[in-house]
Amino acid sequence: ATGGGLAPFGQEVEATIPALRRYARALTRDRDIADDLVQDTLVRALRSEHLFHGGELRSWMYTILTNLNRNRLRSLARRPILSPIDDNDAPDLAGPEGGGRDISRALAARVDEQREALLLVVLEGLSYREVAEVQAVPIGTVMSRLARARAQIKSYLDGERPTLRRVK
C-alpha cells in the first residue's frame, strides 16, 4: 500500500461495505447487529484474502456475511429461553423423544434461507447463479426458495386485505 492507503484487495473489499450494510440490516432487522456482522465480515475477508480465487468479490463477501449470520442464529438457538412458556398455549411438537426443537429449528432455518435468497435477488440484484454460490446450493434450490418466499409474501399481503367474495 502506498501512502498509508489500502492495498487493491482492501480497496475492493471496502467498496462492498454499503451493499453489505444494506443486506445485513435487511437480514437482521437490527442496526447494531448488522454493523457488527459487517465488521466481522470485513475482518474475515481481509484475513482470508488468500482463499479468494478471483471471480465476483461481492458474492464472496455475501457468502461470508451469510455464513456469519447463520452461525449467529445457531448460537442464539442454543441459548436457553429465559421467559417461561405456558405449556397449555403451545402445541406439543416434541412428542415422546423431544424432537420438536429440531423441527422448530428446521422450519426457522428454511424461512431464513428463503429470506436470504429473496434479499440477495431483490435488494442486492444478484443473479440466481450468484445466490446459488452464496448459499452453496443448486440453482434450482434458489428458484424454489424464491418461489416459496414470494408465495408467503403474497399470502401475507392477501391476508391483510379484506376478503371479497364474488356473488353470482
Predicted feature residues:
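A short, charge-rich alpha-helical start-of-domain segment used by transcription regulators
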Residues: 1-22, 32-35, 46, 115
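Sigma70-family region 2
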Residues: 2, 40-57, 75-76
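Conserved RNAP core-binding helix
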Residues: 31-48, 139
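Arg/Lys-rich amphipathic alpha helix in sigma70-family domain 2
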Residues: 63-84, 96, 155, 159
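DNA-recognition helix of helix-turn-helix
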Residues: 66, 135-159
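A short pre-motif secondary-structure segment
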Residues: 117-121
